[in-house]
């Protein structure tokens, strides 16, 4: 799934 972290201003894809 896609997880976005606003406070780090980035998105990662982990299932």
From Swiss-Prot:
Protein name in the entry: Omega-lycotoxin-Lp1a
Organism listed in the record: Lycosa praegrandis
Location(s) in or outside the cell: Secreted
Additional record remark: The primary structure of this fragment is identical to that of Omega-lycotoxin-Am1a from Alopecosa marikovskyi (AC P85079).
Keywords: Calcium channel impairing toxin, Disulfide bond, Ion channel impairing toxin, Knottin, Neurotoxin, Secreted, Toxin, Voltage-gated calcium channel impairing toxin
Function: Modulates Cav2.1/CACNA1A voltage-gated calcium channels (P/Q-type currents) in rat cerebellar Purkinje cells and hippocampal CA1-CA3 neurons. At saturating concentrations (>10 nM) decelerates activation kinetics and slightly increases peak amplitude without affecting deactivation kinetics. In vivo, does not cause death when intravenously injected into mice. In rat models, through its activity on Cav2.1/CACNA1A, has an ameliorative effect on memory defects provoked by hyperstimulation of N-methyl-D-aspartate receptors (NMDARs) in the hippocampus.
Protein's UniProt keywords contain Secreted: yes
Domain of life: Eukaryota
Lineage, uppermost ranks: Eukaryota, Metazoa, Ecdysozoa, Arthropoda, Chelicerata
């Amino acid at each position: 799934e896609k997880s976005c972290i606003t406070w780090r201003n980035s998105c990662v894809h982990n299932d």
